[in-house]
UniProtKB/Swiss-Prot annotation:
The modification Phosphothreonine is found at T36. One of its GO terms (cellular component) is cytoplasm. Disruption phenotype: No phenotype upon growth in liquid culture. Binds 1 Zn(2+) ion per subunit. Gene3D superfamilies: Anti-sigma factor, zinc-finger domain. Keywords: Cytoplasm, Metal-binding, Phosphoprotein, Transcription, Transcription regulation, Zinc. NCBIfam families: anti_sig_RseA. The gene is rseA. Residues 106-132 are annotated as: Disordered. Interacts with ECF RNA polymerase sigma factor SigE, interaction is abrogated by treatment of cells with H(2)O(2), detergent or vancomycin (the latter 2 cause surface stress). This probably inhibits the interaction of SigE with the RNA polymerase catalytic core. Induction: Total levels of RseA decrease after detergent or vancomycin treatment of whole cells (at protein level). This is Anti-sigma-E factor RseA. Zn(2+) binds at H63, C67, C70. It comes from Mycolicibacterium smegmatis (strain ATCC 700084 / mc(2)155). It comes from the Bacteria.
Length: 132
């Protein structure tokens, strides 16, 4: 069976480049990370926090060795992480705790008005449309 990907890409060639497919992979194929792509904000945070799988970590580390822009983003994320860890503990004001404790746990039960209920097909009070 022929690959329909070229037809799809050609049909949407009028779209701006950020919407167009940048790879020659068939349409619907899993997206692969390209070494020339920049790391996403989520990937940078996961890299700094040590949450990436080993294969993803190695790909990101290789990209960081080649891309000073992403390396600067990782450095900034690391500094932000360190600043948050070294900051003073956050104290919750007692007035806020008091207001939060007054929030009801359940919503009050309100029965809907009969006139506001949806009209269903089997409802005998529902008006019938007449043929013209």
């Amino acid at each position: 069976m022929a690959d329909p990907g070229h037809v799809f890409r050609r049909a949407f060639s009028w779209l701006p480049s950020q919407f167009a497919s940048q790879s020659d992979a068939p349409v619907g194929a899993p997206r692969q990370f390209g070494s020339t792509e920049h790391l996403s904000v989520e990937a940078i945070a996961a890299f700094v926090d040590g949450e990436l799988r080993m294969s993803a970590h190695l790909r990101a580390a290789h990209h960081l060795s080649l891309c000073p822009e992403c390396a600067a983003e990782v450095d900034a994320q690391s500094q932000a992480r360190t600043a948050l860890r070294e900051s003073c503990p956050i104290a919750i004001p007692n007035s806020l705790l008091g207001m939060l404790s007054q929030i009801p746990h359940r919503t009050p039960e309100v029965t809907p008005d009969v006139s506001e209920q949806a009209k269903f097909a089997d409802d005998p009070t529902r008006g019938r449309r007449k043929r013209r």
